[in-house]
Every structure is written in C-alpha cells, then in structure tokens.
C-alpha cells in the first residue's frame, strides 16, 4: 500500500511540476511525509499492546455518559504544512481515500446535539511525534494508474562496450515495406559521363526587334602615332602576267660595261727590216745568259717596201728578193728562251725575239709589248672563224645563245647571251633591279622623304628596308 501511495504521490508531484510551478514541490513533499507517518502508526503493534483502543476510548465514553447536555468533538490536529493553493488542478482530489490503510470513519455521537454550535475554538498545540509503527504486510497490486506526461529526455549515457563477436544468426523473414523516407542530402558530383550523341538541329529562332540607336559617344582623344613597323618578308614571286602593250621609248641607258677582250687576230705581213745598228760587245754573266748592252742610236729610215701579192708573205717566205739590198740592215741582238708568260713580261729589251717553251711560239718586242710571230706551226694554224657576235646570226659552235645585232644591254640578249636575273644588267619591263643597277631609282625617288641605300633581292625586286625617314 505504501508503494502505491509513493507511486501516486510521485505521479502527483510530476504532474504538479509539469502543470503548475516548480514551487509546488515542497508542499507535495510535506503531504507525502504526513501520509507515511499515519500509515506507520496504523500498522504498528507496539501501540496496540501499550495503549489499546478501548482503553483509550473509556474516558471519552465516561465523559459522554456524564455530560448529557452537549457533546462536542475536538477537531483534528492541523497539518504540518499549510495546504497548497491551486488555481488549475488540485492534487488532493486524485488521492483515493478508500485505499488508505487507516479507515477514518466518523463515529456517530451517542447523544443528539441540542445546542447551537458555537464558533470554532482556537487550534490547540501540536502534539508530540509518535513512535514509528511496524510496517504492515504488503498489499495487493493496485490498478494500473493513468500514464503520466512524457518527461524530458535524459542525458545521453556513455557508449557501451562493444559486445563479443559471435556468428551471425539466420536471416529473418523479409519485413514489410516501410514508409517512404525523407529525401537525402545531395551526393557528391560523379565523374563526367561519355559525350552524348549530337542532338537534332533546333528550329531557327525569330529575328528579334531592332534596338534603338544609342546616343553617339563623345569623340575620344587622338592617340599617339604608332611606331613604324618592320617591313614584312617578300612573298614568293607570282605568276608572270600577260605581256602589256609596248610602252613609250625610255631615255637612253647608261654606258655598258667594257666587253671582254677579243681573240688576237692573225699576224700581219712583216715589213722589211731596217738597217741594223752597230752591235755591242756581248758580256757573259755568271749564269750563262747574254746581257743586252745599251740601246744604240736610231737608224736611218728605210725605203718604202713593195708588196708582192702573188705569193703569201710570211715569216718563213719573205719577199726579200724584190726589195733592194739595204745598207747595214739591223741585226737582232739575241733570242731569249723563256718558260712562261711571266718570264716573257719581265724582259724589257727592244728589237729582241723570245721563244716561249710552253706554247712553242716566237714573240717579238714592239712598242705596245710582246706580240706573237708564230702561234703554231704552219700546218697546225687554224683558219679564221666564220661569223662573229653582232652579225645577227646565231653561231652555236661559238657559244652564242642569241644575236640581236645590237649592243643594247637592257633587252633580253646581251653579248649574244640570254639575259637572266643576276647578270648585272637591268632588263626593262621584267626586273626592278639587278645587282647594283637600280635604273634611275634611289631612296629619295622610291620613298619620297627618305634617305639611305636600296637593296636588290635575289628575285630582282627592290628592297627598301635600308631607307630611313627623318625624325
């Protein structure tokens, strides 16, 4: 019975705490202590032996018998604590008084009250605390009380120790399908998938309306002039276009370069030799060569020679018999033998003959230098070549490629050779320059206001990167 009271008191306290205020806890605790003390007195056997109930009630019956006029009952002792004042709920109404261990049944008075009940008297002094009674037998289990309100969640306990590993049990039957759960958090971004197929071409959109023309902005400040960039590389030579109409005759070109020295012509007919001067005494040198003496005085002029046109007059066959005998004819002082042309040029002797061993030919000294008398033996002498450069006949055997019969160096045939880029001659209409020949162009005429030197590329075009402007 005490356990039931404790449970109800605890429920009452919990409901009082939840429904009313936290200050109701001391009042409920005082009520619980009073009930516990009354139960202890009722179950105690010691009081039954020491003070029996009949012995205790004898004085009261004696008083009842002696007093016949009026019978007054003393009020019960006041509680230890004042009763609580509830505005919302009353905890005492929930206590079942029928289940209390002590049945408080009012005793009917043996005498009838005939007098008027007066006002209640003052409360008497509190009696002494009684001796704790003996705990009675355990009562029957009472009915299940009403479920109390849900309490606050308690503090989370410490994590338990992991259990001992054991073999997994058999797989149970498949449970029923649960309710649909809440949407989970978005997962991490997965890897990029393969490229999809190309979709169909969409329809052409409608042309939008033309927007309004904006306000014309203010004119900006004039920027600084940029730097002169480098001239780009010359591109490849383009395909030659169709020849244009013949232009007007240009001004005469400059004088061409000196041509190559032509072949030496055949030696002419030797004239009669003049009278030789007096010969000096030869002096023998240490090397065995003859030393030429000093030059003698000029001799007298000889008579006019005659020409015999019937027989060819050569060095071998001169027509001496036709001429009159000269008085004191000039004599050759010596004939020198040399190995090469260098040794021949070192000889400065006049009226002398020299024989070159490398050509096996004979030379004589003239005022202009050494001239050949016989280049080769008579039977090996070649005849005069037929044709020459400028006769308007192409002589392939002479190495001619063309023959226009003029000496103009600005056309396509120069010195019986085809003109080409790099020969040093500017070809009119096809080349801008060639070598050092720029025609009449300079930096000043090609780029007005500049100075410097023009250059000619390998494709015979003018390169003006060498020209500079005045800054």
Curated annotation (Swiss-Prot):
Record field: compositional bias (Low complexity): 155-164, 242-251
Mapped Sequence repeat ranges: 388-413, 420-443
Domain Collagen-like per the UniProt entry, residue ranges: 118-282, 293-307
Chain positions covered by the region annotation Disordered: 140-205, 237-267
Coiled-coil boundaries: none
InterPro entries the UniProt entry points to: Collagen, Collagen_superfamily
A GO biological process held by the record: extracellular matrix organization
Keywords: Collagen, Disulfide bond, Neurotransmitter degradation, Repeat, Signal, Synapse
Ranges where the record places region 2 X 26 AA approximate repeats: 388-443
Residue ranges of the region described as PRAD: 70-86
Pfam families, per database record: Collagen
Signal peptide feature range: 1-30
Reported tissue expression: Expressed in electric organs but not in muscle.
GO MF: extracellular matrix structural constituent conferring tensile strength
Domain comment (free text): The proline-rich attachment domain (PRAD) binds the AChE catalytic subunits.
Protein family (similarity comment): Belongs to the COLQ family.
Protein name as annotated: Acetylcholinesterase collagenic tail peptide
Origin organism lineage: Eukaryota, Metazoa, Chordata, Craniata, Vertebrata
């Amino acid at each position: 019975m005490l356990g039931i009271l404790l449970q109800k008191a605890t429920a009452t306290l919990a409901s009082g705490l939840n429904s009313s205020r936290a200050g109701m806890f001391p009042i409920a605790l005082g009520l619980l202590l009073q009930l516990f003390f009354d139960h202890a007195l009722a179950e105690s056997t010691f009081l039954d032996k020491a003070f029996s109930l009949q012995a205790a009630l004898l004085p009261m019956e004696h008083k009842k018998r002696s007093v016949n006029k009026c019978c007054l009952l003393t009020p019960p002792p006041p509680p230890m604590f004042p009763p609580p004042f509830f505005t919302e709920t009353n905890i005492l109404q929930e206590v079942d008084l029928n289940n209390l261990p002590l049945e408080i049944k009012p005793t009917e008075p043996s005498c009838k009250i005939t007098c008027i009940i007066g006002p209640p008297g003052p409360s008497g002094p509190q009696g002494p605390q009684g001796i704790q009674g003996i705990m009675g037998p355990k009562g029957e289990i009472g009915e299940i009380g009403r479920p109390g309100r849900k309490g606050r969640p308690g503090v989370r306990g410490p994590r338990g120790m992991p259990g001992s590993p054991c073999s997994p049990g058999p797989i149970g039957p498949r449970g029923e399908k649960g309710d649909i759960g809440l949407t989970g958090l978005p997962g991490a971004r997965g890897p990029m998938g393969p490229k999809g197929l190309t979709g169909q071409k969409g329809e052409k959109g409608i042309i939008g309306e033309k927007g309004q023309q904006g306000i014309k902005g203010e004119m900006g400040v004039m920027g600084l002039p940029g730097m002169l960039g480098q001239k780009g590389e010359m591109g490849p030579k383009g395909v030659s276009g169709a020849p244009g109409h013949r232009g007007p005759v240009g001004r005469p070109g400059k004088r061409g370069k000196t041509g190559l020295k032509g072949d030496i012509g055949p030696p002419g007919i030797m004239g009669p030799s003049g009278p030789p001067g007096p010969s000096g005494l030869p002096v023998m040198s240490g090397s065995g060569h003859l030393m030429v003496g000093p030059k003698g005085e000029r001799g007298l002029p000889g008579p006019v020679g005659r020409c015999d046109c019937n027989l060819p007059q050569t060095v071998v066959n001169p027509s001496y018999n036709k001429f009159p005998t000269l008085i004191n004819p000039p004599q050759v002082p010596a004939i020198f033998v040399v190995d090469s042309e260098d040794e021949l040029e070192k000889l400065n002797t006049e009226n002398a003959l020299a024989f070159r061993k490398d050509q096996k030919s004979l030379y004589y000294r003239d005022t202009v230098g050494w001239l050949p008398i016989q280049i080769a033996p008579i039977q090996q002498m070649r005849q005069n070549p037929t044709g020459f450069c400028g006769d308007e006949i192409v002589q392939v055997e002479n190495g001619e490629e063309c023959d226009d019969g003029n000496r103009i160096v600005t056309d396509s045939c120069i010195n019986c050779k085809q003109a080409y880029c790099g020969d040093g001659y500017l070809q009119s209409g096809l080349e801008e320059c060639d070598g050092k020949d720029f025609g009449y162009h300079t930096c000043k005429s090609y780029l007005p206001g500049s100075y410097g030197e023009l250059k000619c590329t390998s494709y015979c075009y003018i390169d003006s990167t060498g020209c500079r402007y005045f800054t």
